[in-house]
Amino acid sequence: TQGVSSAASDVYKRQDWHYLWQPLARHHQVIACDMLGFGDSAKPLEHDYSLLEQADLQQALLAHLGIAEPVHLLAHDYGDSVAQELLARHYEERIDIASCVFLNGGLFPETHRPVLTQKLLLSPLGWMLGRTFSRQGLAKSFRQIFGPQNRPSESVLDDFWSLVQSNDGPRILHKLIGYIPERRARRERWVSAMQRGEVPLRVIDGALDPISGAHMVERYRQLIPRADTVLLPSIGHYPQIEAPLAVLKHYLEFRDNLLSPSSRLACS
């Protein structure tokens, strides 16, 4: 079967996809990596982190694994932007994308509402905040962006924090946050790619996410022709953790629909 390439790596990537990995792997070949600067990957301090470089690395991984067939992208958060760049490259015939599903993420700079920690990391003093960032700070941030009925357990927070800490991660948080202005600079390219309509797209979004929740989906419906969206009403920023069964259901439904003749005709 065609591969599912997860372009969804972010600071907490591995824990993000823990609940979906085995169910997806039963149906598809699943490929994912910790992106540069995230999880257990290298986190060089003297490095300019770029979404374009992250897309390059995803393509390099596919080439290394000998994956030549079209890939299906499943992305979240930071990974949404990487997936948008890969989608734009599809239309430049630099990669073959079969479909793309976005979970909560900043698809449009005008609807992205950064939390206080992100704003501070973007400031000239961001490097100081990164070096003092703690598990307590992580827990506070997560409680703001999870749905009120789906607060993360202490065990989940421990797992997330271990990935942030890996390879001295807090010292580069101010470097990684550069994706926010980079999104603004590449908005036209990425939104235009989503509007082309030749690659099937779906958004599965936790509506209560204060960063990229229902307000982002409303904008998506305004800008994207024949918008295919699923709003999860009581869910926050991490639907794959807060409601993994719902995400799996809506993702597999999307993939099944791609096999129908009417779906192929609509996207041809």
Show where each model-derived region lies.
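A short, Lys/Arg-enriched amphipathic alpha-helix followed by its capping loop at the start of a domain
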Residues: 19-28, 64
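Conserved catalytic core of two-component sensor histidine kinases
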Residues: 5, 18, 25, 248
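Single conserved hydrophobic/aromatic residue that forms the stacking wall/gate
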Residues: 1-8, 12
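Alpha/beta-hydrolase-fold serine-hydrolase catalytic core, especially in secreted/extracellular enzymes
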Residues: 259-268
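Flexible "cap/lid" subdomain of the alpha/beta-hydrolase fold that forms the substrate-access gate
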Residues: 10, 15-16, 31, 38-74, ...
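Catalytic histidine-centered segment of alpha/beta-hydrolase-like enzymes
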Residues: 232-248
